[in-house]
From Swiss-Prot:
Taxonomic superkingdom: Bacteria
Protein name: Chaperone protein HtpG
GO cellular component assignments: cytoplasm
Keywords, sorted A to Z: ATP-binding, Chaperone, Cytoplasm, Nucleotide-binding, Stress response
Subunit details: Homodimer.
Gene: htpG
Main location, first listed in the record: cytoplasm
C: annotated segments: 564-635
Pfam family, one: HSP90
Ranges for region A: 1-346
Purpose of the protein: Molecular chaperone. Has ATPase activity.
Length: 635
């Protein structure tokens, strides 16, 4: 937008190691979709103008008498360059070094650890990470950035330059107008981009929704030269109004998808979106998207969260996490409020009644979107659940007002089909309950395999009663808030004295009573031998194929949760389990006849194998092996 000259005091610096790695990966993984460079650079230019507009609310002098913000795209066939210019906030020297030479964001190490070498998969990850400015090097073998931050003098501009190979130079420069010019020196095989029609086509496809005017030199056909020739007049090539302010009927699905890619910097299309204008107690417009893939930093506490916040179409901040509850932190998009003050801060957002109304309304809108997807687009919902199901489970504790709605959206693995895929809803389970059954049964474990092979399931399989198999880390926390569904209690098959009386006939009840009396002496011997390790020993009806299992009280922390707490360095109470024995198992019969000299070893072996089957670590593995070998030699 303005001519620039540089002084000679240039300094050469090295890229951060992660930048070099990202540049190499990006050039090789994203080349098939190389046109995104223009989308990314125009998006950056738009952000720079938004930030200037926001800072100028308190410092109007930053506008320097030029309040018409715009983006300009030009090309020079002779020089083989494309230039993207803006008159936004600009960069100081320190900002240029920080923003153009390093990746200053959390989760960088996790991002690189997930790269596989598969171009398609890595392209998706790189897209999630956000390539931004570095996408320039997909099509350019040298990039020059000329920038002056608003408020600095003309001779305090900077010139940044790099070939993307590992180093960049930065030098003082003079620049009459504020803002940034990004000059791409194209690679030898990128001639097709030196074409006004091609650039306009890319801009209209990827950046039509940008609210600022994107201008290019008007071109007319020159019959003598046989080509389009640029004139001095500029024309706006995009619609230049905020997409979310338009009527839904005037927006195509493709425009919605491209807007998502701009606000999220995602490489892939969104899974679903909702666009609404809300009027009443609080007036705002929301355009919210559910991504198709979870970001690599979904579980990083310091990662970016939330949506873009605008007030009366003026950009206020990125990642306004207060506008959505934490369990919907994967949602991307824009919320434009008509009621919040323009000088709103993050502190005000935490206390504002209007923000609470927006958060509640937006949560309900996203849940409605998910409900519609679950009911009408089963494959899409299965994709959503695989990517974000564990996060949605957090909502059972965080959002009491919507707990029932969230519960209906949950999906689990189940003994119904024995598959690891989490496809069973509570409604599915209730619809298959046996006559007389009034509880929803579940088992928790460290892994799906451990849950599916839990000895606690044996009696349920025998009776044909379905059990939900829960192995996500969040499940135990979720269950502390979610106690029932549709009036039916959620009951762990590994807690308390299992009551299946409603499913047993009179003859079976009589037999159970007789067996308990018959095995009373053995129970007392085991109780005495294991007094230090267990709270109680009792005969069980929950086992069919296993000799014993351990359970805890109905209101005690499960062994699975205790292990999680200890692994996280948290204090965990010592809970003595109850040992339940299977009176019909041959090993129990063998122990019943054991001599006093051997009984202690048999009792300890029975407890240790029950603990191992439950997924616990036994206190003394060496003693367990020695004891087992000794008893095997005597067998």
């Amino acid at each position: 937008m303005s001519q620039t000259t540089t002084t000679s005091a240039s300094e050469t610096l090295g890229f951060q190691a992660e930048v070099k790695q990202l540049l190499h990966l990006m050039i090789h993984s994203l080349y098939s979709n190389k046109e995104i460079f223009l989308r990314e650079l125009v998006s950056n230019a738009s952000d720079a103008c938004d930030k200037l507009r926001f800072e100028a609310i308190d410092q109007p002098g930053l506008l320097e008498g030029d309040g018409e913000l715009a983006i300009r795209v030009g090309y020079d066939k002779a020089a083989r360059t494309i230039t993207i210019s803006d008159n936004g906030i600009g960069l100081s020297r320190d900002e240029a070094v920080a923003n153009l030479g390093t990746i200053a964001r959390s989760g960088t190490r996790e991002f690189f650890s997930q790269l596989t070498g598969d171009k398609q998969k890595d392209a998706q990850l790189i897209g999630q990470f956000g390539v931004g400015f570095y996408s320039s090097f997909i099509v350019a073998d040298k990039v020059t950035v000329l920038s002056r931050r608003a408020g600095l003098a003309a001779n305090e501009a900077i010139r940044w330059e790099s070939d993307g190979q590992g180093e960049f130079s930065i030098a003082p420069a003079e620049k009459a107008g504020r803002g940034t010019d990004v000059v791409l020196h194209l690679r030898a095989d990128e001639d097709e981009l030196l074409n006004g029609w091609k650039l306009r086509e890319i801009l209209r496809r990827y950046s039509d929704h940008i609210s600022l005017p994107i201008r290019m030199a008007k071109e007319d056909w020159d019959a003598e030269k046989g080509e389009q020739v640029k004139g001095d007049e500029l024309e706006t090539v995009n619609q230049a109004n905020a997409l979310w302010t338009r009527n839904k009927s005037d927006i195509t699905d493709e425009q919605y998808r491209e807007f998502y890619k701009t606000v999220s910097h995602d490489y892939d299309d969104p899974l679903a979106w909702t666009h609404n204008r809300v009027e009443g107690r609080s007036e705002y417009t929301q355009l919210l998207y559910v991504p198709k893939h979870a970001p690599f930093d979904l579980w990083d506490r310091d990662a970016r969260r939330g949506v873009k916040l605008y007030v009366k179409r003026v950009f206020i901040m990125d990642d306004a996490e207060q506008l959505l509850p934490s369990y919907l932190r994967f949602v991307r998009g824009v919320i434009d409020s008509a009621d919040l003050p323009l000088n709103v801060s993050r502190e005000i957002l935490q206390e504002s009644r209007d923000v609470r109304a927006i958060r509640e309304g937006s949560a309900k809108r996203v849940l409605s979107l998910l409900e519609d997807m679950a009911e009408n687009k089963a494959e899409d919902y299965a994709t959503f659940w695989t990517e974000f199901g564990q996060v949605l489970k957090e909502g059972t504790g965080e959002d009491a007002a919507n707990r029932e709605r969230i519960a209906r959206l949950l999906r689990f693995a189940s003994t119904h089909d024995g598959e690891q895929a989490q496809t069973v809803s509570f409604a599915d389970y209730v619809g298959r309950m046996k006559d007389g059954q009034d509880k929803i049964y579940y088992v928790t474990a460290d892994t799906f395999t451990a849950a599916a092979n839990s000895p606690h399931l044996e009696i349920f399989r025998k009776k044909g009663i379905e059990v939900l198999l829960l192995s996500d880390r969040v499940d135990e926390w979720m269950l502390s808030y979610l106690r029932e569904f549709d009036g039916k209690s959620l009951v762990s098959v590994a807690k308390g004295g299992l009551d299946l009386a409603e499913l047993a006939d009179e003859e079976e009840k009589k037999r159970q009573s007789e067996v308990a009396e018959t095995f009373k002496p053995l129970v007392e011997r085991l109780q005495q031998a294991l007094a230090e390790q267990v709270k109680e020993v009792r005969v069980t009806q929950r086992l069919v194929d296993s000799p014993a299992c351990v359970v805890v009280g109905q209101n005690e922390l499960s062994p699975h949760l205790l292990r999680m707490l200890k692994a996280a360095g948290q204090e965990a109470p010592e809970v003595k389990p109850v040992l339940e024995i299977n009176p019909d198992h041959a090993l129990v019969a063998r122990i019943r006849d054991a001599s006093d000299a051997e009984f202690g070893d048999w009792a300890a072996l029975l407890l240790d194998q029950a603990l191992l089957a439950e997924g616990a670590q036994i206190a003394d593995p060496a003693a367990f092996v020695k004891r087992l070998n000794g008893l095997l030699l005597k067998a």
